[in-house]
């Protein structure tokens, strides 16, 4: 099972997504793919911040389609994820490093559900010891 990061969903929502993303998504069994509530918040914020117009309307419609498609596969930042976030964030802090947010929250959700993560930005996820798939390079 795979948690899709915000950058992957954002790319898939474009009018012309990268061919590698389209191919990778087409090859996955839909029931194995999940979103996080954090990704939904990031997408809603990004769309909400746009000026009124066709682009905003198209992205709003695309997000509505994503929400419908993933209705039963959206994972929340719950108490289990909060515990994992705290565990994961303490280690880098002790080493004098930061732990990113919101990627840290997405990492914690994936870790609490034992999911791999599909993302272009792999650093936070690999640092947490998660299995990471980069669909932009998966075919390479």
PLM features: what roles do these ranges have?
Residues 11-12, 24, 46, 85-88, ...:
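Residues that scaffold the ATP/ADP-binding catalytic core of kinase and kinase-like folds
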Residues 45-54, 72-120:
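Active-site neighborhoods of divalent-metal-dependent phosphate/nucleic-acid chemistry enzymes
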Residues 107-140:
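Acidic, PIN/NYN-like endoribonuclease modules and their adjacent C-terminal/linker elements
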Residues 1-35, 39, 48-65, 139-140:
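Short, well-structured N-terminal submotif of metal-dependent ribonuclease cores
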Residues 4, 17, 97, 101-102, ...:
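A generic structural signal for residues located within well-ordered alpha-helices
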Residues 9, 40-43, 82, 125:
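A generic structural signal for short hydrophobic patches within well-formed alpha-helices
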């Amino acid at each position: 099972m795979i948690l899709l990061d915000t950058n992957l969903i954002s790319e898939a929502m474009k009018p012309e997504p990268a061919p590698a993303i389209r191919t990778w998504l087409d090859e996955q069994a839909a029931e194995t793919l999940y979103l996080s509530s954090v990704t939904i918040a990031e997408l809603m914020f990004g769309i909400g911040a746009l000026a009124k117009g066709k682009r905003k309307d198209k992205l709003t419609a695309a997000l509505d389609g994503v929400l419908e498609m993933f209705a039963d596969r959206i994972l929340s930042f719950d108490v289990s994820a909060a515990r994992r976030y705290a565990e994961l964030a303490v280690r880098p802090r002790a080493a004098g490093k930061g732990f990113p947010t919101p990627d840290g929250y997405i990492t914690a959700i994936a870790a609490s559900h034992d999911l791999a993560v599909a993302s272009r930005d792999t650093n936070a996820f690999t640092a947490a010891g998660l299995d990471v798939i980069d669909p932009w390079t998966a075919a390479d």
